[in-house]
Amino acid sequence: MRDGVQCSSKVGMVSEYAPQPLRLAAWCINDSSTIQHEFLHAVGVYHTHTRSDRDEYVTIHWDNIKYRFFRDFCKRSNSLTFKTKYEPRSIMHYSWNAVALDPLEPTISLKVLVISHEEQFLMLYLSHVVI
């Protein structure tokens, strides 16, 4: 691990003979989700919103993304989905306004409503409650 001004990691093994660079700035040390996100990059996991099937689930607002971050939103044609559902709540998915030119506007918006198993159960349970 290296100290830095950002929290970042290369995706996957860089070299058999050199340490894997993992940068954790002071501001992200106390944020366990950011640390987990960067460790997952280090072991080879890409961002969820770069999946080859992402356009079925989200819209990318290119006009609101800071130019230097464009590559973080490019689809990976060879990405493996492992036949899993698209999960916008994944620790590997950017937030709705990540790296936005205008943080009040989205960089990513959902096309479909995603409901967790817990929410599905609650909805089913509530549908059977007699008031």
Q: PLM ranges: what are they?
A:
Residues M1-I131:
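Zinc-dependent metalloendopeptidases
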